[in-house]
Curated annotation (Swiss-Prot):
GO-annotated cellular components: cytoplasm
InterPro entries per UniProt: NA-bd_OB-fold (IPR012340), RNA-binding_domain_S1_IF1 (IPR006196), TIF_eIF-1A (IPR001253), TIF_eIF-1A_CS (IPR018104)
Lineage per the UniProt record: Archaea, Methanobacteriati, Methanobacteriota, Stenosarchaea group, Halobacteria
UniProt keyword Chaperone present: no
The protein, known as: Translation initiation factor 1A 2
Length: 94
């Protein structure tokens, strides 16, 4: 915790990253993402997250769209439910 109000310093998107919500699991290490820029993308869960970080439907994640194929993205970070609530309260996501 960063102060007494309960606000935490959260990882925010870089220039090439967007917030996204997981719509469904597509099997293996793939998910369907609804990104904040209005696009639906196929997300790939990298090996470093595959077994350590469980990603479920409805989770808020940070996604990095591919430069060469805009309809696909890598999942870079998963926010906990508490962190997602804080992002909503601060107006970063809907």
């Amino acid at each position: 915790m960063s102060d007494e109000s309960g606000r935490r310093n959260l990882r925010m998107p870089n220039d090439d990253e967007v917030f996204a919500v997981v719509k469904r699991h597509d099997g293996g290490n793939h998910v369907t993402l609804q990104c904040e820029d209005g696009k639906e993308r196929m997300g790939r869960i990298p090996g470093r997250m595959k077994y350590r970080t469980w990603i479920n439907e409805g989770d808020v994640v940070l996604a990095e769209p591919w430069d060469w194929q805009d309809e696909k993205a890598n999942v870079e970070w998963r926010y906990s439910d508490q962190d997602a609530d804080q992002l909503r309260e601060e107006g970063h996501i809907e």
